[in-house]
Amino acid sequence: MSPLSIISRRPQPQFRRRQPRHIEFLGLPFSLLQQVEVIRLITEQGGAPYRYIVTPNAYHVVTVHDEPKWLLPVYRAAWLSLCDSRIVRALARFDRLPLPLVTGSDLIAALLATLNATDRNHTPRRILVIGPQRAVEGVLRAVYPNLTIDVMPAPGALGQSADMRRAVARACMNRTWDIALLCVGCPAQELIAQQLGELGCKSGIALCVGASIDFLTGASSRAPLWTQKAGLEWAYRLSREPRRLWRRYLIESPRIFRIFMTERALRGR
């Protein structure tokens, strides 16, 4: 039995928080919500206690399996856990599980557009973007003029430095925001989201959404739609950034198939 399978069955009272409808798959919780439902929930959370959203893909699943004691509680503490991978969804379908696909990039584009439209005659929603270069701030403000946009660049290699992650979390605490978009990669963004709660963040929603803002602003090119639908977005991204992504897509992420088969064997399927 895998370490993650054992840990996932233990109670996590200090981290666990009730989520809207969810299932367990590959050792992680996944919310059974469509994108439109997620946006509705987010927009209805004004004044609610602080909470965060994770968007696990194949790489996230593998990363959590590598460090279950460290990372699994972080994903379990999330308010929502949205499937951001067509490969993960395909594996779920193979197991006859109705797992919706809600990619971080599509979610953020739709969420900001919705907030921009609904905030036209109300107090503008304050959006803090952590990670990208400050140059994207002007682009976002031009596209979403009815939102208050604040971009906070973050250093690289946050995944290897607990001190740097805590410094970023403290910097977020010193800003005023309703929604924070954490765009610093897995697992740094999820750990920072959890740290915000530990530091006493009272309200707001943090979304862990990787490179979504880079795609949205054109800083990075997203795969053509047909490539996305074919489940080959990873190949497109690899072709664009081979030095940075070759290990993730060719060595680490494919391990999800072994994880899937191990989980099926444990369930007796």
Model segments located where?
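A contiguous pocket-lining binding segment that forms or flanks enzyme active sites
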Residues: 164-203
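A short helix->loop->beta-strand "cap" motif at the edges of active sites that frequently abuts
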Residues: 50, 122-125, 201-205
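Short, flexible loop segments at boundaries between secondary-structure elements
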Residues: 154-160, 202-240
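Conserved beta-alpha
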Residues: 88-176
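A transmembrane-helix-recognition feature enriched in membrane-embedded lipid enzymes
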Residues: 89-90, 222-269
